């Protein structure tokens, strides 16, 4: 969830909005009652408050997995460009580069206090810690949740050198002054309440910034609802619909505490709130996993792997109770946030080369400024296309307006989605995501073949646009080769 606030109560300079970005993990749109209207048997009233107070997006895109979605948000670049398409593992060398500016680094010259709390997943080494990328403070874990409890498995090697080389680090508390503290392992027991630890740190940081009359950028990342879900006794059985539903209710309560903090500080009326997550639902662990009506799941080329919840409110600026069908991506938030603080030229400036706090950056932002659409939804959104990538860094599909072309398909399901090779197609699969948003008609409709052949004129333009995207890598080459699970 993202919050931008122009409160005179929170900051002496009302042109500098506060920014609070709150994320769930592996939560698909249909797991939130603002989207599902209660059909899943539970409600998320606090998250729904954000949707009801502003804009709910129906065509919002994360990425195919955790690292890619988070990298796209914080850098404003396509994950292929940063080389951060593969899920980061303990001990991996890949991570966010100092050559790629973050939202936090770009906000520091505007006087912001910056804090990141909760899951990071943008690199294992100290050089990758958020406190080395523009954040004043970081407190959280570095990987996907199920990597954290591996040392407790009875088959885990007892050799301390193995754990040192390949094991997960603990929950890290680090600061921009170079201090790094390992607060201990994220054990199965600690997982029950780690989001409460993260929430407490976040609330304290907001209080600190408010007392200092400084604008803040806070990125809050929960472990809910990544597998494996471990709930404290008080959160178990509250819905009667299983562990995922119970976890969602707990997660919604944490969102409520953040919104209540804004009320307590009297800044809610001047705050933009955006809620989202990194990727689509992960079905393989159901019922300890998300659910989606879209085809596929996390780490596939299908909509179910990419569609994420996204909603934004800003009382007095954004009208309440709106629904937008514009295509929007996590990559769009960097230029949008910078526009909200008054910098509408950040994309062009970074492309030419821009010095920020003594460091020169020259990067190609793939995101677009959505602020004009937020303020007046009668204006079309600036994004007309979306490039889908595999975790190995290949273009697998493109959405161009209503139409999607799939060039590489993942035919496997469940865990096999992570193991099976991609099938390179001789001609793209084609879908109209308005007529067929769930990508079913190629195997359900008897007339799909005729419809496909009648729309083959769309193939060449889609290939041209992918080629145009790839051409930008000539001047802005891939930062690093993505990681791999095979040698």
Where do the protein language model's features map onto the residues?
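Formylglycine-dependent sulfatase
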Residues: 3-428, 437-487
């Amino acid at each position: 969830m993202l919050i931008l606030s122009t409160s005179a109560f929170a900051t002496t300079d009302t042109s500098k909005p506060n920014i609070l970005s709150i994320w769930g993990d592996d939560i698909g749109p249909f797991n939130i009652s603002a989207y599902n209207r209660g059909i899943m048997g539970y409600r998320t009233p606090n998250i729904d408050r954000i949707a009801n107070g502003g804009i709910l997006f129906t065509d919002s895109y994360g990425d195919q997995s955790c690292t890619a979605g988070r990298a796209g948000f914080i850098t404003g670049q396509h994950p292929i460009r940063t080389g951060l398409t593969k899920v980061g593992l303990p001990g991996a060398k890949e991570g966010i580069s100092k050559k790629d500016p973050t939202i936090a680094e770009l906000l520091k010259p505007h006087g912001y206090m910056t804090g990141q709390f909760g899951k990071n997943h943008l690199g294992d080494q100290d050089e990758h810690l958020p406190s080395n990328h523009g954040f004043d403070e970081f407190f959280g874990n570095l990987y996907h949740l199920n990597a954290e409890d591996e040392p407790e498995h009875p088959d885990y090697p007892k050799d301390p050198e193995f754990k040192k080389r390949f094991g997960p680090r603990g929950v890290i508390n680090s600061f921009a002054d170079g201090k790094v503290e390992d607060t201990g392992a994220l054990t199965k027991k600690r997982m029950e309440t780690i989001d409460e630890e993260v929430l407490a740190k976040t609330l304290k940081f907001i209080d600190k910034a408010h007392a200092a009359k400084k604008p803040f950028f806070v990125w809050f990342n929960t472990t809910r609802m990544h597998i494996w879900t471990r709930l404290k006794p008080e959160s178990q059985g509250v819905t009667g619909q299983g562990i995922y539903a119970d976890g969602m209710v707990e997660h919604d309560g944490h969102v409520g505490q953040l919104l209540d903090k804004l009320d307590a500080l009297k800044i809610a009326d001047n705050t933009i709130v955006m809620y989202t997550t990194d990727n689509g639902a992960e079905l393989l662990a159901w019922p300890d996993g998300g659910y989606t009506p879209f085809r596929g799941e996390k780490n596939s080329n299908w909509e179910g792997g990419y569609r994420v919840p996204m909603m934004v409110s800003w009382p007095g600026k954004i009208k309440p109770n709106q629904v937008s069908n514009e295509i929007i991506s996590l990559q769009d938030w960097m230029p949008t946030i910078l526009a909200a603080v008054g910098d509408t030229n950040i994309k062009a400036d970074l492309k030419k080369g821009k010095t920020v706090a003594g460091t020169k950056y020259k990067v190609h932002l793939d995101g677009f400024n959505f602020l004009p659409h937020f303020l007046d939804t009668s204006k079309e959104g600036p994004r007309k296309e979306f490039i889908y990538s595999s975790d190995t860094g290949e273009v697998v599909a493109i959405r161009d307006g209503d139409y999607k072309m799939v060039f590489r398909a993942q035919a496997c399901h469940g865990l096999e989605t992570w193991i099976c090779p991609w099938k390179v197609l001789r001609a793209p699969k084609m879908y109209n995501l308005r007529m067929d948003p769930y990508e079913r008609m190629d195997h359900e409709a008897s007339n799909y073949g005729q419809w496909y052949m009648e729309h083959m004129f769309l193939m060449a333009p889609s290939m041209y646009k992918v080629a145009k995207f790839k051409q930008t890598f000539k001047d802005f080459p891939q930062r690093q080769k993505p990681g791999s699970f095979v040698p």
